[in-house]
Amino acid sequence: KTIDQARAGYGPKVDLNLGYGREYTKNPATRPDSETLTRGEASITAKQMLYDGFYTKSEVDRTSAAANSAGYAVTDISERTSLQAIEAYLDVLRRQDLLELTQTNLQSHETIFSQIQQRAESGVGRQADVEQAQARLSLAQSNLESQLGNIEDARTNFQRVVGIMPEDISNPGDDCCDKAPATLDDAIKIAYHQHPMLRSALADHEASLAQENAAKSAFHPRIDLDLGASANNNVDGEPGKDKGLYAMFRLQYNLLNGGADMARVEQIEHLSEQQKELINRAKREIALEVRLAWNALENANNRLPGLKQRVEAAEKTREAYASQFRVGQRTLVDLLDTENELLSAGIEYTEVYYDRIYACYWLMQSMGKLLETMAIEQREEAITVANQEADTE
């Protein structure tokens, strides 16, 4: 609507004036007498701007840039909010997987405890082994209770961010990671071109430049086309009807305004310089965010293969130790330690696995591409300006 208001300056202004009443007149034309007449007035005027020093164009540019800035700001907020929702979503998945690991670990400890207890009751095992197995079983039960609390916390946080409780959620996989750029430099270039925070700052600067041009229009003349028609009755003490038509070109040129116009221009120029600094600050913040997300993704990518190998090795070790324990080649402590090692390896792998997925979405958000990656519609204003600038560049 503000853009429409600015564009209205291109159109004509038409006014209708009507008047009816009594008029008392005593002037040289009526002296020594006076006249009291019933006065009637009717007129219509039309004014069309022909030249205003590009004030109207500048106002249209300013309001358009301001609208685009607001659109990009909304997109930026949407991207950040979406990332928070993704983080909460992945945290629920993470806690579910960790819960499954602790449940499996508890089942293994229950099986071991049952076997050790049976051996002790039959006189083959020692009571100390039973107590050792009981202690590890209690720890596994405690770990399970802890994970149950963690998953409830994750579900509650998801509801706080998204507004609903998570139901039937699934692992998003590597779809987002497959869309990551090849290099850090590529990621920063994309962010400089597309990030809504930077686009908003650039649009604000465009608005300040347009505002500066609007202020400079005060140094130009204004030219209007004026058209008018009138039909009056009993005016100024003269009985009878009075009709008239006119068509005029009018030029208005301010010669002196006490320096107010120049002061206004200088004020806006200062504002424009401030907007440039905000653009530079936005670039620095965006580049930093991209680097942090990139480093997080690289770190996870580098760690995952080794952690996966650790889990596989821990599984093989547990199977081997279980077989060796049954023939007396391994102690109970050795067997219990393999269960804890497998749990520890699984937990660390799961943590880094979901850290990697989150880092992929974080990288997309830091580049301003998260909504696009998730196929979420953006504000029309932001898309229009982004496409125009992409064509220009």
Predicted regions and their residues:
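Small/polar (Gly/Ser/Thr/Ala-rich) solvent-exposed segments
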Residues: 13-36, 47-76, 199, 218-245, ...
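Periplasmic alpha-helical coiled-coil/stalk elements that build and connect Gram-negative outer-membrane
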Residues: 80-190, 293-296, 300, 341-342, ...
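Metallo-beta-lactamase
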Residues: 147, 196, 352
